[in-house]
Amino acid sequence: MRYAIIILMALVLANCSNDDKKINETEYLISDSILAWDTNLDSMIMRRDSTIPDSGITIKRIINGLNEKYPEVYIDFLKQGGDTAYTGVPDADYLGEQMGDAGAMAWFADAVINITSVPGINYVSFKMDTHSHASSTVIGRGEYNDWKKE
């Protein structure tokens, strides 16, 4: 009987743990390259990527996502001032001369919608050389308020 109590106590103590892990705690592995929104200029629809938690949306990840999606149009994050993200497109030839009006508009929409999904950013300033279909500008998220969100 004494051995049974000792074994029972040992089992109880062995099963007690002081882990700080919460039951049902979900861990997210977030890529360094994301786009929070999938945009479609033709239908004026933006679809939120539900696999990305709000806490995972950072300017660095969004910029990396844009550069991965549009390798011909490299965008740099320069700084944040107030609610504006300042960016640069060092070589805007492809954007301004080869993508056409619709392509450039789609790129700007994708960039603005995704960059302004970062908390605290409402405007994006683009610095680039002037081209036929693209030039330096500042665009706010409000430009896309009439788009349907899904």
Predicted regions and their residues:
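A generic structural motif
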Residues: 1-2, 79
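Short glycine/proline-enriched turn or capping motifs at secondary-structure junctions
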Residues: 2-3, 138
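Sec-dependent N-terminal signal peptides
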Residues: 3-13
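Bimodal "functional hotspot" detector
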Residues: 16-150
